[in-house]
Amino acid sequence: MWKRLLIVSAVSAAMSSMALAAPLTVGFSQVGSESGWRAAETNVAKSEAEKRGITLKIADGQQKQENQIKAVRSFVAQGVDAIFIAPVVATGWEPVLKEAKDAEIPVFLLDRSIDVKDKSLYMTTVTADNILEGKLIGDWLVKEVNGKPCNVVELQGTVGASVAIDRKKGFAEAIKNAPNIKIIRSQSGDFTRSKGKEVMESFIKAENNGKNICMVYAHNDDMVIGAIQAIKEAGLKPGKDILTGSIDGVPDIYKAMMDGEANASVELTPNMAGPAFDALEKYKKDGTMPEKLTLTKSTLYLPDTAKEELEKKKNMGY
């Protein structure tokens, strides 16, 4: 009798161990592929999943929330082990996240946060301190102009995106005690190069062919790279006639720095999935709940280290 019980217990333990060791499947609702940084984030997520033996299913939202919601519902229907979301905007997520919660599928937010009353609808948000990122650019500008008058034009990210809201806020906080620095125009460039160029062209036209503009602050590098092209086409020198400051740290911004056409960028790591996978595996193993906010590092880079930083970006999928 005892021998039989021991055998049954051993089999049960083995089956439990096998269940824990079973490969995980994660659905990832990605915003889109609007920038070099976003492409790198997707590439790094694939790499992080592969080295853990996790099956990663990626759905490109094409910068539309309705597409992302459909993808999340599809992942719920498929019965995935977890869902990662890089939310295009901060609001409107409650209904679909409740569906995931009812299905007992944990949700992890990457890069961007959401605005929900019920914080139990997601496990954690893996993101940078986007307010700090905006502030780092603002602090740099205050020192750079050293009290001289400086009119700034701002290329905002996607309207309603948490990163756009926070990066705007951080920059504004940094310059609030610098009366010599004023934001004279601000408009969304939707985080894309083409839109960044288009909006910058309108800013230049409205401001005496750019002569009234001291600096362009963009919520990501891709928009400022588009703006650099617009500045050049207007017969001005980017990085000199009009200073630039942006966020992401993509390879092309370091190339622009090396060419003397860009001044400052705050690097945002594309590895948002790694910490999320770590948290998921701990949760699946023993129920460990992660902190609600997992912050990644943000660092200001200037032209003097551009070549070195560019080398680090090789083979990252930008």
From Swiss-Prot:
GO CC terms of this entry: ATP-binding cassette (ABC) transporter complex, substrate-binding subunit-containing; outer membrane-bounded periplasmic space
Keywords annotated in UniProt: Disulfide bond, Periplasm, Signal, Sugar transport, Transport
**Residue span of the signal peptide, if any?**
1-21
Q: Name one Pfam family in it.
A: Peripla_BP_4
Q: Which cysteines are joined by disulfide bonds?
A: 150-214
Annotated residues for binding of beta-D-galactofuranose: 34-38, 111-112, 167, 220, 248
Q: Name one GO molecular function term.
A: galactose binding
| UniProt keyword Membrane present | no
Subcellular location as annotated: Periplasm
Biological process annotations from GO: galactose transmembrane transport; hexose import across plasma membrane
Keyword Transferase attributed: no
Q: What does this protein do?
A: Part of the ABC transporter complex YtfQRT-YjfF involved in galactofuranose transport. Binds to both alpha- and beta-galactofuranose.
Tell me which family the UniProt entry assigns to this protein: Belongs to the bacterial solute-binding protein 2 family.
Q: How does it assemble?
A: The complex is composed of two ATP-binding proteins (YtfR), two transmembrane proteins (YtfT and YjfF) and a solute-binding protein (YtfQ).
Q: What name appears for this protein in its UniProt entry?
A: Galactofuranose-binding protein YtfQ
Q: Which organism is it from?
A: Escherichia coli (strain K12)
